[in-house]
A protein has these predicted regions:
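Cytochrome P450 heme-binding Cys-pocket and its upstream "meander" loop
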Residues: 75-82
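Short glycine/proline-rich turn/loop motifs
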Residues: 82-88, 170
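Non-catalytic, structured segments within soluble enzyme domains
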Residues: 160-164
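Feature 926 captures the class I aminoacyl-tRNA synthetase adenylation module centered on the KMSKS loop
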Residues: 1-64, 68, 112-151, 155, ...
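A short glycine/serine-rich beta->alpha loop
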Residues: 58-59, 86-97
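Adenylate-forming
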Residues: 69-73
């Protein structure tokens, strides 16, 4: 199979083919197939006969036409307006095994035809290997088809597995990674439902304060960290490093769920006119909006579902998040203020130790803490004081005692059952 060479050859009176003098088709006749078409001045019954002609039996290799894929896709010669708008293209995604063939031949043809590169960037992927990290082939019988995986784990989970593979490296089919992706998708659903539940008034109407209502240090710290994620994830996507973008976003998301949501959930349930409540709600809404958009390229279905609960239109038509979406004054560099960030760091650290104590004692996470004693430096104790109310509420702390000391420590005295 392939594109036939549009060439015929004369057959002399003795039946010998004269390869020295090819018969070429006029340009306005192209394309032609010499195995069925007849050269000018001959008839079909002269094929293979003395004094007649024969067609060239060879075909071009696959790269002869594959090397023109940017031009073919762009409507070259057929749609000049489209071609002017899309060529040169932005990106050629391809695997590493055809760099010297497809990539090289495409660049050469573009240079010869247009004097230009066919695209500005090339993203090199690896192969998808079987679960034993062997190259898949029909002869080996180790081909893994995607449909059963999509049906079992869902499209978002399969996309998560694919997006976890580093550019330029081979990636094995890994159902364990797909299960991780499914858990992430379910967590997005549940965490979003939890967060949006804190934004609803008594009749269920969502009330979202503006971002300038964010005043609590712990809320500002969370949004400050998110601003950094926005900058890093955006830079990764612009460099086609989707795995890095996912890694940074996912890491923040799990910390957001495990620490921040637990710390602010009580405050977010307060009266709407309370500044602390407004701060928590504005921060929750802002963070959720940004996180959904950051995750949308990898988890398109679950993010679209959550977006439809409280936003108009498709998330995939929404603007990509910027640091401005994380609050006023975030700045393009998205630098985190150390003093503000220490509030969230200290609160999360102390809450984690409280949880550990309850787990060790085999007590419910709702079990009250009679006395929580924290020993640390003045700066870290000041950071804890800025989030004291949230730590008390999240940990069920009755009494919080702080002590200055060079040797940090947390003592948890649980209330009697």
């Amino acid at each position: 199979f392939g594109v036939p060479l549009p060439v015929w050859y004369r057959v002399d009176a003795d039946g010998e083919v004269d390869f020295a003098v090819p018969l070429l088709a006029d340009e306005d006749r192209l394309p032609v197939d010499p195995s069925t078409d007849v050269p000018e001045g001959y008839s079909a019954d002269q094929r293979g006969e003395p004094g007649g002609f024969v067609g060239d039996p060879d075909v071009m290799d696959t790269w002869a036409t594959s090397s023109l894929t940017p031009q073919i896709a762009g409507g070259w010669e057929d749609d000049p307006d489209l071609f002017a708008r899309v060529f040169p293209m932005d990106l050629r995604p391809q695997a590493h095994d055809i760099i010297r063939t497809w990539l090289f031949s495409t660049v050469v043809r573009s240079e010869l035809e247009h004097g230009a590169l066919p695209w500005s960037d090339v993203a090199i992927s690896g192969w998808v290997l079987d679960p034993d990290r062997k190259k898949m082939s029909k002869s080996k019988g180790n081909v893994v088809t995607p449909l059963p995986l999509l049906e079992q784990h869902g499209a978002d989970a399969v996309r998560y597995w694919a997006a976890s593979g580093r550019p330029g490296t081979d990636t094995a089919v890994d159902e364990g990674q797909m299960k991780v992706g499914r858990r992430l998708a379910m967590k997005v659903l549940n965490a979003s439902r939890f967060a949006l539940g804190r934004l609803a008034d008594e009749d269920g109407t969502l009330v979202v304060p503006p971002l300038d209502a964010v005043t609590a240090p712990i809320d500002r710290a969370m949004l400050g960290r998110l601003a950094v994620v926005v900058v890093e994830a955006t830079a990764a996507f612009e460099a086609y490093d989707y795995a890095r973008a996912l890694e940074r976003t996912e890491s923040f998301f799990w910390a957001f769920c495990d620490d921040y949501l637990e710390l602010v959930k009580t405050r977010a349930y307060g009266e709407a006119d309370d500044p602390g409540t407004a701060s928590a709600r504005a921060a929750l809404a802002g963070a959720l909006s940004v996180l959904l958009r950051l995750l949308a390229p990898v988890l398109p279905f679950v993010t679209e579902e959550v977006w439809s609960w409280w936003q108009v239109g498709s998330i995939h038509a929404a603007a990509w998040p910027t640091v401005d979406d994380t609050g006023p004054g975030a700045g393009s560099d998205a630098a985190v203020d150390p003093a503000t960030d220490a509030v969230l760091e200290m609160a999360a650290e102390v809450l984690g130790l409280v949880r550990r104590a309850k787990t060790t004692a085999k007590r419910s996470m709702r079990a009250p803490v009679a006395v929580l004693t924290v020993t640390d430096t003045a700066a870290r104790l000041a950071a804890l004081a800025a989030a004291e109310g949230d730590v008390r509420d999240a940990g069920g702390v009755v009494e919080l005692v702080t002590r200055m000391g060079d040797e940090a420590g947390v003592e948890v005295e649980l209330a009697e059952e």
